[in-house]
Regions:
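An amphipathic alpha-helix adjacent to DNA-recognition modules
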Residues: 11-16, 28, 48-73
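Pre-recognition alpha-helix immediately N-terminal to the DNA-recognition helix
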Residues: 12-21, 95
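Hydrophobic alpha-helical connector segments
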Residues: 59, 70-106, 124-128
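Amphipathic alpha-helical packing segments from all-alpha helical-bundle domains
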Residues: 72, 112-163, 170, 174-181
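Short, hydrophobic secondary-structure boundary micro-motifs
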Residues: 107-112, 193-196
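C-terminal peripheral helix-coil segments that are non-catalytic and often amphipathic
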Residues: 136, 167-246
């Protein structure tokens, strides 16, 4: 019994330390040695609980993605009672792309999640269930495994668009529209409906929504790991600055 509690203490210390270091330095800038030193745990204790750094990333990734589809489930209401079920997916993925543009540290966290095979498999399996909910009517013969296979492709699209930062020649609104055109087309949403969905997404204040989502994530992390996290990662790293209306 003591061993179980010792493992739980190690898990909590490592995750708490990793959250803080990842947000301060990014995943690539955080070494295993730094995590072990600041968490005050031995290498053997760490390996017994997590195996390696990817094991830590997997646990944090589950927290990062846990609330995203709950927001997507309610997003369709933004277009009214006749909203397309695909709008919830478009909304969620648009917010995700926007979050990745708020800070290079956040982009790094997302990219690490997509780069880890274990984390990516978790994302694909969970996303496939939501794809089936949102897109079954467009693909009536598909089962969950079919949607899983589709998500192998759409998650590749997401990773590709996340890897390429915005620029003057490739602003965020263009990035989101390109992604939605491609992903919704792959999922067999009719062209006219794709246009309606994309126009609906353009009406949303995605930056404000994305910042609120990150703040909510920080609140969850703060409560879970008893940390004081402040969203100081929003700053000059943001691309596609909007011009002042005045």
């Amino acid at each position: 019994m003591a061993r179980r509690y010792d493992s739980e203490a190690v898990r909590n210390r490592v995750l708490s330390t990793s959250v803080r270091l990842f947000l301060e330095r990014g995943c690539h800038g955080t070494t295993m040695a730094a995590i072990l030193k600041e968490a005050d745990v031995s290498s053997s204790s760490f390996q017994n609980v997590f195996g390696n750094k990817d094991g830590v990333m997997y646990e944090l990734m589950k927290l990062m993605f846990s609330g995203q589809f709950s927001a997507a489930d309610s997003a369709a209401a933004l277009l009214g009672p006749n909203a397309s079920p695909a709008f919830a997916y478009a909304f969620e993925t648009s917010v995700q792309l926007t979050i990745a543009e708020l800070s290079e540290i956040i982009r790094d966290l997302y990219l690490q999640a997509y780069a880890s095979e274990r984390s990516l498999e978790y994302i694909r399996r969970n996303t496939a269930k939501h794809l089936q909910k949102f897109f079954q009517q467009y693909n009536p013969s598909f089962d969950e495994e079919d949607f899983y296979q589709m998500d192998i492709g759409t998650s590749g699209l997401m990773l590709g668009f996340m890897l390429r930062p915005c620029s003057d020649d490739f602003p965020l609104d263009v990035k989101i529209e390109r992604y939605l055109q491609m992903s919704l087309s792959v999922l067999n949403v009719p062209a006219e409906e794709r246009t309606t969905i994309i126009e609906g997404i353009k009406q949303q204040d995605l930056r404000s929504i994305a910042k609120a989502a990150v703040k909510q994530l920080f609140d969850v992390l703060s409560d879970t790991f008893d940390l004081e996290l402040q969203a100081q990662i929003f700053g000059e790293e943001e691309c596609d600055k909007e011009e002042s209306a005045e």
